[in-house]
Amino acid sequence: MARLGLAVCAASFHLFLLLASTSSLRRAPTEADTANHARRTAYHFQPAKNWQNDPNGPMYHNGMYHLFYQYNPHSALWDIGNLSWGHSVSGDLLNWAALDTALDPTSPFDANGCWSGSATILPGALPAILYTGIDASKEQVQNVAFAKNPSDPLLREWEKPAYNPVIALPADVPGDKFRDPSTAWLGRDGLWRIAVSAEVDGVASTLVYRSKDFVRWERNAAPLHASRAAGMVECPDLFPVAERGEDGLDTSANGAGGVRHVLKLSVMDTLQDYYMVGTYDDAADAFSPAEPERGDDCRSWRRLDYGHLYASKSFFDVRKNRRVLWAWANESDSQADDVARGWSGVQTFPRKMWLAKDGKQLLQWPIEEIETLRRKRAGLWRGTRLGVGAVQEIVGVASSQADVEVVFKIPSLEEAERVDDPNRLLDPQKLCGEKGAAVRGGVGPFGLLVMASGDLHEHTAVFFRVFRHHDKYKLLMCTDLTKSSTRAGVYKPAYGGFVDMDIDDHKTISLRTLIDHSVVESFGGGGRACITARVYPEHVATSSSHLYVFNNGSDAVKVAKLEAWDLATATVNVVVGDHHGLVAPALELEPTRTTQ
């Protein structure tokens, strides 16, 4: 951490006093509230208790990170009429303090719920929130709220003007299909723009609205995107990316050279997030995809994640000049389990996103702050040969709370499984189900067995397998949950996607996996393919988990490099300290300004 100047130290101490004394902080939960449970995460974002779903309005303001989220303050279950905006603050995107809810359903224009939306920093450093309200007639309308005191580092109070809604339900849109306003961007004509999801005359549409003052909005005649086949889409996110390099761009960035745009949509029918890279013309408010052959049906676009991820939301982190992604990872067991735990839903670990060199796909990687949680490291492996059927344990790390990075070297692709029917390659998830980790292959399956019991009766397999179709090789990445738990009533699919890279070129493939009790996030090929999974092994109630590297192919593979670390537990919304519920001194929430 950079050395802080005297002024910053004073500001940090002042902020600590604010946090320690404010009534907005939630008091220390009871033992039942905290759900000190083997499946509760240690460094993923989740409230101390109750239901959460979509991430809303992430932003960096006055030296603090803010994350809002869909939250039911009264229950661990989703409830249409009780959704509020939860609110937490952080100095490092790792440790979080929970504040009082920012928005509650208290007005006629949101009487039946404060649903998803976004935050925008207006001129004069005024934070504004646009969100969907379910009004007294149970119709979806778009509302605005402003920070009551923009100089408050915690932004504890928000005002909802009486003139809401700022966008009423359009006549050609059903009352229950008009929601999720995006972060606003400023066009070169000086007008603000937002994207809103709607179903217009039966067509899934991403509408564009313009405004001079952030209060009076006019709809653009043509939608930004429309798909007759996709069904209702949600949580639109339009953002710029640099054509070269990993730096992020402000949401309003535009220009003829050096900038592309990404349109991300969440599809209700599949509960998956899809995106397309392209160009955006702010004069016509038109988006042109870089891969038009994928068609208008966004279900044929690229997947943001091939696993259990939905309703993602990105923001530009001006502090570190990067674009950061959040997303909801719902539970995969039953509502009865949610009630018994007292909580439901986590956010994926924040990811940095940037454009790959091919200009067509995004790369995603855990933000660098996670490295500050690394503690004990397992022995470094280099050049270890994994023969046919090899299963080797990675010892020396707490396997239920770890960060694992491994690079596999494939000596030869000659034994890659041949696929004559190209239709078999159209559904990678189905292929992962048919060709699981236990099914002997040619080149692969090889990878990791995580959250495994000592006898391997329970394990989650994260692996690769190479196929050959004519003279081209296809690299499949899978997360197989079929053996993840012996419990009944748990959703245990095999997730999968193809890694868009030329495996024939270098014959190496990297895998990084974050393990956090019930969450397993994996990044293949340097972040070209990502898979998020929720797992619920039974053995954790009585014994420790194990971590293995394996190869079940008919050809040997090499572990060119393997490193694994224990990860420390972050302080995430569960307020700890003395009996008064004060913030723990270890919770770093100082403003991140620097002085010379």
From Swiss-Prot:
PANTHER family: BETA-FRUCTOFURANOSIDASE, INSOLUBLE ISOENZYME CWINV1-RELATED (PTHR31953). May play a role in sucrose partitioning during seed development. Its EC number is 3.2.1.26. It is found in: Secreted, Extracellular space, Apoplast; Secreted, Cell wall. It comes from the Eukaryota. SUPFAM superfamilies: Arabinanase/levansucrase/invertase (SSF75005), Concanavalin A-like lectins/glucanases (SSF49899). Substrate binds at residues 51-54, 70, 78, 115-116, 179-180, 234. The active site is at residue 54. This is Beta-fructofuranosidase, insoluble isoenzyme 7. Gene3D superfamilies: Exo-inulinase, domain 1 (2.60.120.560), Glycosyl hydrolase domain, family 43 (2.115.10.20). Disulfide bonds join 432-478. It comes from Oryza sativa subsp. indica (Rice). GO terms for molecular function: beta-fructofuranosidase activity.
